[in-house]
Amino acid sequence: TRDYKDMLNQISSLGFNTIRMPFSLQAMRSTTTSGIDYGGGKNAELAGKTPQQVMDIIIDEAARKNLMIILDNHSQADDGFMFDLWCGHAGFTETDWVNTWTSLATRYASKPNVIGADLKNEPHGSATWGTGAANDWRRAAELAGNAVLAKAPNWLILVEGIEGQVAGGQQLDRHWWGGNLEGVRDNPVRLSRANRLVYSPHEYGPGVDAQPWFSDPNMASILADR
């Protein structure tokens, strides 16, 4: 393990300018951290800090290295389980999720290097698009996205896709988790500031999973369609 400053230095030296910083809803409510190596004086500034305070420190250090930050709600609980929806795991509700984003937007709106919110990592499974139901990701993204923009109007709002279950049907049978944006054509995400919206589908190569289109003889045209 390494010191966080050393890692930020390497990221900068490699020419990257933006970090997607994951967090869990549980961490933002916790008073203690775990998994940080303090051996040999590493990460001394993080000792005794809450997860929120650790985030503060890393964001400020990133700013000193001209690194931008996009916050990413990667999971609900600290177990890292990739639950399909943005709520409903480990007792967290949709209100908890929106309130967490509102709190983060309020806290970091004045930080010039915090530039965006990736609202939910890879919605999949029971997540739908454009149905208007409780599990409609488009509806939830509008709810949280507009809550963020009310506090941080200049942030980018990253909205990933889903996996399946698009209202009115979809052209392709299979998609990656977070990769299905077919529903956008008929049901786009509506934000209070339309120019802050970034559709952010997740796509992978065959090393992650041998999706059928990778072995299809018409792969070139399939990729063009995607």
Outline where the language-model segments fall.
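An active-site-proximal structural segment forming one wall of the substrate-binding cleft
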Residues: 2-19, 23, 27-119, 136-149
